[in-house]
Amino acid sequence: MNQQELFDKYQDTFAAQGQDLFFSPGRINVIGEHTDYNGGHVFPCAISLGTYGVYGVRDDDQVQLFSGNMEGDVVSFAITDEAPEEAEDRKWANYFKGMLVYLRQKGFKIDHGFNLYVYGNLPYGAGLSSSASIEMLMGQVLKDEFNLDIDQIDLVKLGQKTENDFVGLNSGIMDQFAVGMGKKDNAIFLDCNTLEYKYMPLELGDYEIVIMSTNKKHSLAASAYNDRVAECGEALKRLQTKLDINSLGEIDEDTFDEYSYLLNDETLLKRTRHAVFENQRTIQATKAMTDGDLEKLGRLINASHVSLHFDYEVSGTELDTLAEAAWQQPGVLGARMIGGGFAGSAIAIVKKDQAENLKQKVGEIYREKVGYDASFYDAEIVDGPHKL
């Protein structure tokens, strides 16, 4: 949908003219999966697929939201209404409402209503952080339209708080940080323990990143995700009987080997090994980027997928098929699942002149093995949320 079409949709929905158009990206994570809530490092970037919002001011106290992606009516509530939406066909609005509620609770002045028409081109359920994209879109709209003096990282933290406390989903800080702090042509090397970060140019030369979506319709990700968070929490508790640590991200491989006897449980051993080794792989990957060693980066990305399959057990047939099929294709440096797991997407780093071949060959293998089509997208690395 182009900009004019978005304004037309706003007009059709609210019988008024929209004033401003905003965009908020999705994200991919090059490496560092399931490390954010374990206090480790991640290496994500914002992508050109994302969420658009057309804003228009109202002269009453009502917020009216409409999604071009959801079936249903306009969701309307007063700016002073702090209760999460309970009805199934209104729950999507909580990602927006939570940001409004928490900004007002922090004392920011949001003193009149508004309309917001929202449309996203992120494939649904692809694990490209549509929820963080929405939260940071709302944050940016409110920041700009109401002239809120809030630091971008504080806005990112409110995005995570919305996800955790208002929507009720466990998540680390990575998704909101990657979206909210995105920078064109750069990935973000982020320490999720301290929120120290640095931008690193994603210089891939003759290579590009291709996003491969499973198009899987149903996902166990939410329940399994919460299980993994709990398992890592239990592992941390056992290690803390001898180690002065606050997160698994503080441990290196040698410390893991030395103190693994404290875990004394096969599942906890595997989960902790992934958290520790994936964190170290992420640190090594950024060094490989600095050294211009793309082949090493590719090997680390492959190792990440293997660890997510065997130790963290979150990949599943669809994601394994995509990654393993990509490994067999010419010009591919590395491929792995990204996101929570079980469904969603994988990425491949592939030579630009082999990208179409990758999409065709992996697509054929996937269709034959899984029974329906995968989708492929070229990842363009873009800035965070902004007014267009």
Swiss-Prot record:
Binding site for ATP: 67, 125-131
One of the Pfam families matching this protein, by short name: GHMP_kinases_C
SUPFAM superfamilies (UniProt xref): GHMP Kinase, C-terminal domain (SSF55060), Ribosomal protein S5 domain 2-like (SSF54211)
Protein's GO biological process: galactose metabolic process
Residues engaged in binding Mg(2+): 131, 163
Keyword ATP-binding in record: yes
GO cellular component, one term: cytosol
Protein name stated in the entry: Galactokinase
Gene source species: Limosilactobacillus fermentum (strain NBRC 3956 / LMG 18251) (Lactobacillus fermentum)
